[in-house]
Amino acid sequence: MNRSIVIILLLVIGLPAHGQAFKAAVSPLVEASCIDCHDADTDTPLNFEKIGHDLSDAATFRKWVKIFDRVDKGEMPPKKKKRPDSVLKNSALAVLKADLSAANLKEQAAQGRVVARRLTRLEFEYTLQDILGIGGNLARHLPPENASAKFANVAEKQGISPVHVRSYLTAVDAALDEAIALGPKPRGGGRDMDYRNNRYSSMWFDRPMRNGGQTVMRTDDAYVMFSYRREPFVARSDHMGYHFPYPGLYRITAEGVGYQAKTPIGFGLYKASDKHGNTELIGNFEIKPGESRKIELTQYFELGEFFFPAGLSLDAAPDGKIIYMMRVKGARGYQGEGLAIKWLKIEGPLEEEWPPTRTRNLLTGVPIIWLPKHRIYWTHPTKAPKEHLRDVVKQLGPKAFRRPVTDAEIESFVSLAKPHHPKEHPMHKMVRSPLRAMFSSPQFLFHGGQPGPLDDHSLASRLSYFLWKTLPDEQLFALARDKKLKDPKVLANQVNRMLKDPRSNRFVDDFLDGWLHLSDIDATTPDEKLYPEYGDTLRQAMLAEPRLFFRELIDRNLAARNFIKSDFTFVNRRLARHYGMANISGERMRRVALPADSVRGGLMTQASILKVTANGTLTSPVKRGHWVLASLLGTPPQPPPPTISALEPDIRGAVTIRETLAKHRDVASCASCHQHIDPPGFAL
């Protein structure tokens, strides 16, 4: 049978009467300009011999959308191929556009624009933290998101499974454990970390270097460290008998001085957990040569975490040696820079009262008494326990569901509580079952709202999760109750207010993690020998630059063209040194003007972008070109055909990356995308 007849039959079979226009207009274009490269005998992801025309099928609909876009933009057929007749092309595109639009509207009318969207891991964590007044990493208990183009809040990619439900319950249990704190009151005062005289740290002063010793030393009034690579093992607070006994805010104060320092050094503070395997730089304070500096840091710590101090931005000895090369003389013979810690103190948890405010707010109206015999606090109901419980659910329900709750909803959760027993099942345990159910319910996990225009409460919720990643605050709730939020002036004022709130940084961080792929910053680790300058301080500065840059554009309402080329950026001393900029001191990130001939400016030349589009050792024109097309231009290229591997083209004789990719582009199925990917990739 003639192939053109086969194609027409395949495209027409099953078409309703209104689809006959498709047969007449689209099939001739496919036969004339497409089928030679897109049939069963070619290595491309599109095969017109198999594609149907049932636009109610989501996969088929997406295929025809891509076909329309590429033909409409002139990307297909390729430039080397014969161009289609303009009348034929325009007629086919007009019919295809009409069919796609009609199918899309029909789907929206039947199913709505999108499926129900649930809270992301980040939104879940922030919402529970803000409702219960807690901290802690709750997201770690939840499964990874099935992201779409790096964004986790795309409804059609989200899902919920038995694994999700179990994970939500685990996370809620962890949140309630922290929120209901009725143990003995933490001891006041603080803890002095005596690194000079502690038995554990002292044994490292004289131990041979081959056994990990002699990389630290003590002077008459200080403990000196020369590198953070091994010293954390020596200076870990848990090795000195201290880990954080309660979750909450703690204050760390210390005094440090640069030892043998000829340049500014950093006094770093890290928090870590053996249980969860995470280590995070939480503070970096610059100390100038010859000066002593007192530092202070208030930070949230989880139960069981520990911390350690570290010297950062330390230059090696004049002869180029680092501390680990001092096999004989050790730390006392080393001439490089170090950090000398004179004293360090920890205070906390910083609670004004005990049980803490978060516990009293949760157990609203329930008296809490001290039982000296058992050295614990206990709930002591003054009315029927279920009446107390009803008060708790009535208080938290509107926050959890981001809307008013009905009496029936309140009773449905109250009824889940086990019977009260003063000793075996007291009030503070009785409340857990209803709250556990509430915070794992569809009303909490999914964004509400009915089809059609949003009501005021749904609008308040959409706004708060857009800019704050959490539930509305009391001002938004009040405007929603009064039905004033839809007023354009009121809405504009609220957006401006919310953008000035520190919580809007959650939006900035989360959006840039997805849009610019900053979440991939740790996907590769630069080779230490090739890039010894890369470390935690540079990494933090690299991440801060695009976030502060984006924040500046929002706060000052600057033009979008700054994303491509700007006359300013944000740096600190460490990042400026990486960029080769002079006369920048201090670890504080600040806006700096760029000269007209600077290679910096805009997003594309920022260090974080260049890192997430490299492989840790070499630059990658393909990754960088793909990033430009997908993130800046919004035209992500198609994935390669499954039958095409990166090494399949003949690259014999190629030497440079440019020559390698030139050989790659000789393959027809690769050329159509790489002709767009490679040019911006090489520019970067």
Regions inferred by a protein language model and the residue ranges of each:
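The substrate-binding groove and active-site-proximal loops of carbohydrate-active enzymes
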Residues: 52
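Glycine-rich, highly charged phosphate/nucleotide-binding loops
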Residues: 56
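Hydrophobic h-region of N-terminal signal peptides that target proteins for export
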Residues: 9-19
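Low-complexity, glycine/serine/threonine/alanine-rich intrinsically disordered linker
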Residues: 20-46, 59-75, 79-684
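Sec-dependent signal peptide recognition
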Residues: 2-9
